Amino acid sequence: MSAYRQPVERYWWARRRSYLRFMLREISCIFVAWFVLYLVLVLRAVGAGGNSYQRFLDFSANPVVVVLNVVALSFLLLHAVTWFGSAPRAMVIQVRGRRVPARAVLAGHYAAWLVVSVIVAWMVLS
């Protein structure tokens, strides 16, 4: 005789905001992988020379790729924001025996993100 298993709907997680947000964050890993692959393809095209890079630019101009990159960027931002949001709970930092407030840890992460983004933008655009 087997134990009773209550039937569960397929999209049970979509009814509660916290579960939906968790699932979207987990799905965002697919788009993080896409961006890594895209970066590798860019580097390969640049390394192969001008013609290869032009073919890559033509591929990147395809509307499907543009839409995919916009969706991936939105998921990447969700991934980063939720990652930073969990940092104050995961990192217990103490200074002089007192715990650093969660807002300070969060502000530090966002400040570092901003600095790195400015440096990368400066390197790419200059």
Curated annotation (Swiss-Prot):
Protein name: Fumarate reductase subunit C
Transmembrane region(s): 30-50, 64-84, 105-125
Upper classification of the organism: Bacteria, Bacillati, Actinomycetota, Actinomycetes, Mycobacteriales
Pfam families per UniProt: Fumarate_red_C
Subcellular location per the Swiss-Prot or TrEMBL entry: Cell membrane
Functional summary from the UniProt entry: Anchors the catalytic components of the fumarate reductase complex to the cell membrane, binds quinones.
Family: Belongs to the FrdC family.
UniProt keyword list: Cell membrane, Membrane, Transmembrane, Transmembrane helix
Naturally occurring in which organism (per UniProt): Mycobacterium tuberculosis (strain CDC 1551 / Oshkosh)
